[in-house]
Protein backbone atom coordinates (compact mmCIF):
# COMPACT_ATOMS: atom_id res chain seq x y z
CA UNK A 1 0.00 0.00 0.00
CA UNK A 2 2.96 2.31 -0.49
CA UNK A 3 2.46 4.97 -3.14
CA UNK A 4 4.84 4.03 -5.99
CA UNK A 5 6.23 6.47 -8.51
CA UNK A 6 7.51 5.71 -11.97
CA UNK A 7 11.01 6.96 -12.77
CA UNK A 8 12.39 6.91 -16.32
CA UNK A 9 16.05 7.44 -17.18
CA UNK A 10 16.84 8.06 -20.84
CA UNK A 11 20.42 7.12 -21.72
CA UNK A 12 21.30 4.46 -24.24
CA UNK A 13 18.91 2.18 -22.39
CA UNK A 14 15.43 3.15 -21.36
CA UNK A 15 15.53 2.02 -17.73
CA UNK A 16 12.35 2.20 -15.73
CA UNK A 17 12.32 1.75 -11.98
CA UNK A 18 9.20 1.48 -9.87
CA UNK A 19 10.43 2.73 -6.51
CA UNK A 20 9.42 5.13 -3.77
CA UNK A 21 12.25 7.56 -3.00
CA UNK A 22 12.67 9.69 0.10
CA UNK A 23 13.71 13.31 -0.61
CA UNK A 24 17.34 12.52 0.37
CA UNK A 25 17.39 9.39 -1.81
CA UNK A 26 16.03 11.45 -4.72
CA UNK A 27 18.90 13.95 -4.35
CA UNK A 28 21.51 11.19 -4.14
CA UNK A 29 20.00 9.30 -7.05
CA UNK A 30 19.71 12.43 -9.20
CA UNK A 31 23.32 13.41 -8.49
CA UNK A 32 24.62 9.91 -9.25
CA UNK A 33 22.53 9.63 -12.41
CA UNK A 34 23.80 13.01 -13.64
CA UNK A 35 27.40 11.96 -12.96
CA UNK A 36 26.93 8.68 -14.83
CA UNK A 37 25.26 10.35 -17.79
CA UNK A 38 28.04 12.98 -17.90
CA UNK A 39 30.74 10.29 -17.74
CA UNK A 40 29.00 8.29 -20.47
CA UNK A 41 28.70 11.39 -22.66
CA UNK A 42 32.37 12.27 -22.14
CA UNK A 43 33.44 8.72 -22.95
CA UNK A 44 31.53 8.96 -26.22
CA UNK A 45 32.94 12.35 -27.23
CA UNK A 46 34.82 12.06 -30.53
CA UNK A 47 38.62 12.26 -30.47
CA UNK A 48 38.25 15.55 -32.39
CA UNK A 49 35.46 17.15 -34.44
CA UNK A 50 34.80 15.03 -37.51
CA UNK A 51 36.69 11.95 -36.25
CA UNK A 52 35.52 8.80 -38.00
CA UNK A 53 36.36 5.14 -37.99
CA UNK A 54 37.38 2.66 -35.33
CA UNK A 55 39.41 5.17 -33.29
CA UNK A 56 36.84 7.97 -33.31
CA UNK A 57 36.21 7.75 -29.55
CA UNK A 58 39.85 7.50 -28.48
CA UNK A 59 40.52 9.96 -25.64
CA UNK A 60 44.30 10.31 -25.97
CA UNK A 61 45.63 12.81 -23.46
CA UNK A 62 42.28 14.52 -22.90
CA UNK A 63 42.30 16.24 -19.52
CA UNK A 64 46.07 15.85 -19.20
CA UNK A 65 48.97 18.25 -19.04
CA UNK A 66 49.78 20.40 -22.10
CA UNK A 67 53.45 19.99 -23.07
CA UNK A 68 55.21 22.30 -25.57
CA UNK A 69 57.86 21.02 -27.97
CA UNK A 70 60.31 23.92 -28.17
CA UNK A 71 63.16 22.50 -30.29
CA UNK A 72 63.89 19.97 -33.03
CA UNK A 73 66.45 17.99 -31.01
CA UNK A 74 66.08 14.22 -30.83
CA UNK A 75 66.12 14.23 -27.04
CA UNK A 76 66.41 16.44 -23.99
CA UNK A 77 64.34 19.21 -22.47
CA UNK A 78 61.82 20.65 -24.93
CA UNK A 79 62.21 17.78 -27.41
CA UNK A 80 59.40 15.76 -28.94
CA UNK A 81 60.89 12.52 -27.55
CA UNK A 82 60.86 13.97 -24.03
CA UNK A 83 57.26 15.17 -24.49
CA UNK A 84 55.91 11.73 -25.43
CA UNK A 85 57.73 9.70 -22.74
CA UNK A 86 54.76 9.53 -20.39
CA UNK A 87 51.03 10.18 -20.59
CA UNK A 88 48.38 11.75 -19.96
CA UNK A 89 49.54 14.63 -22.14
CA UNK A 90 48.57 16.88 -24.99
CA UNK A 91 51.60 17.72 -27.14
CA UNK A 92 51.76 21.06 -28.99
CA UNK A 93 54.58 22.52 -31.10
CA UNK A 94 56.24 25.93 -30.87
CA UNK A 95 58.66 25.00 -33.68
CA UNK A 96 58.49 23.57 -37.19
CA UNK A 97 60.86 21.45 -39.25
CA UNK A 98 62.48 18.03 -39.35
CA UNK A 99 63.18 16.00 -36.22
CA UNK A 100 66.03 13.61 -37.11
CA UNK A 101 65.38 10.63 -34.86
CA UNK A 102 68.44 8.75 -33.58
CA UNK A 103 66.45 5.66 -32.51
CA UNK A 104 62.90 4.32 -32.66
CA UNK A 105 60.44 6.73 -31.04
CA UNK A 106 58.15 5.10 -28.46
CA UNK A 107 55.05 7.14 -27.65
CA UNK A 108 53.50 6.47 -24.23
CA UNK A 109 49.84 5.55 -23.74
CA UNK A 110 47.23 8.33 -23.35
CA UNK A 111 48.90 10.94 -25.55
CA UNK A 112 47.41 13.46 -27.98
CA UNK A 113 49.83 14.93 -30.53
CA UNK A 114 48.57 18.10 -32.22
CA UNK A 115 50.92 18.57 -35.16
CA UNK A 116 48.69 21.31 -36.55
CA UNK A 117 49.90 23.62 -33.77
CA UNK A 118 53.37 23.80 -35.40
CA UNK A 119 54.12 26.83 -37.55
CA UNK A 120 54.49 26.25 -41.30
CA UNK A 121 55.78 23.90 -42.74
CA UNK A 122 54.82 21.58 -39.85
CA UNK A 123 56.64 18.62 -38.30
CA UNK A 124 58.45 15.77 -40.07
CA UNK A 125 59.89 12.78 -38.21
CA UNK A 126 62.84 11.12 -40.02
CA UNK A 127 65.00 8.00 -40.00
CA UNK A 128 63.46 5.68 -37.41
CA UNK A 129 60.15 3.94 -36.69
CA UNK A 130 57.45 5.68 -34.65
CA UNK A 131 55.80 3.30 -32.16
CA UNK A 132 52.51 4.71 -30.83
CA UNK A 133 51.13 3.56 -27.49
CA UNK A 134 47.54 2.64 -26.81
CA UNK A 135 44.93 5.40 -26.67
CA UNK A 136 46.87 7.85 -28.88
CA UNK A 137 45.54 10.65 -31.07
CA UNK A 138 48.17 11.62 -33.66
CA UNK A 139 47.39 14.51 -35.99
CA UNK A 140 49.13 16.42 -38.77
CA UNK A 141 52.57 14.73 -38.77
CA UNK A 142 54.76 13.58 -41.65
CA UNK A 143 56.70 10.39 -40.98
CA UNK A 144 59.55 9.67 -43.42
CA UNK A 145 61.45 6.53 -42.49
CA UNK A 146 64.07 6.30 -45.27
CA UNK A 147 67.02 3.94 -45.71
CA UNK A 148 69.82 6.30 -44.70
CA UNK A 149 70.49 4.53 -41.41
CA UNK A 150 71.21 1.20 -43.16
CA UNK A 151 69.16 -0.82 -40.67
CA UNK A 152 67.54 -4.02 -41.93
CA UNK A 153 64.67 -4.22 -39.44
CA UNK A 154 61.75 -4.09 -41.84
CA UNK A 155 61.87 -0.32 -41.68
CA UNK A 156 58.20 0.42 -41.03
CA UNK A 157 57.27 4.09 -40.68
CA UNK A 158 55.03 3.15 -37.74
CA UNK A 159 54.61 0.01 -35.69
CA UNK A 160 51.41 -0.51 -33.67
CA UNK A 161 51.43 -4.24 -32.91
CA UNK A 162 49.42 -5.18 -29.78
CA UNK A 163 48.20 -1.60 -29.29
CA UNK A 164 44.58 -0.45 -29.15
CA UNK A 165 42.80 2.84 -29.60
CA UNK A 166 44.99 4.78 -32.03
CA UNK A 167 43.75 7.34 -34.53
CA UNK A 168 45.94 9.02 -37.16
CA UNK A 169 44.49 12.13 -38.77
CA UNK A 170 46.03 14.17 -41.58
CA UNK A 171 49.32 12.27 -41.27
CA UNK A 172 51.44 11.08 -44.18
CA UNK A 173 53.84 8.15 -44.21
CA UNK A 174 56.50 7.35 -46.80
CA UNK A 175 59.99 6.07 -47.56
CA UNK A 176 59.47 2.77 -45.77
CA UNK A 177 60.92 -0.53 -46.95
CA UNK A 178 58.29 -2.97 -45.64
CA UNK A 179 54.84 -1.64 -44.64
CA UNK A 180 54.37 2.10 -44.48
CA UNK A 181 51.94 2.29 -41.55
Task: Cite the ranges covered by each PLM segment.
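Active-site cradle of extracellular carbohydrate-active enzymes
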Residues: 171-172, 177-181
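Active-site-proximal beta-strand/loop segments in catalytic clefts of secreted hydrolases
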Residues: 72, 94-96, 116, 176
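Extracellular beta-strand-rich solenoid/capping regions of secreted or surface-exposed proteins
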Residues: 81-87, 98-114, 121-140, 145-164
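Residue-level detector of conserved, well-ordered beta-strand and adjacent loop positions
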Residues: 70, 114, 169
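Bacterial Sec-dependent N-terminal signal peptides
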Residues: 1-44
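Acidic Gly/Asp/Thr-rich repetitive segments characteristic of extracellular carbohydrate-active
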Residues: 46-91
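Short, solvent-exposed beta-strand edge segments and adjacent coil->beta transition regions
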Residues: 64-66, 153-155, 178
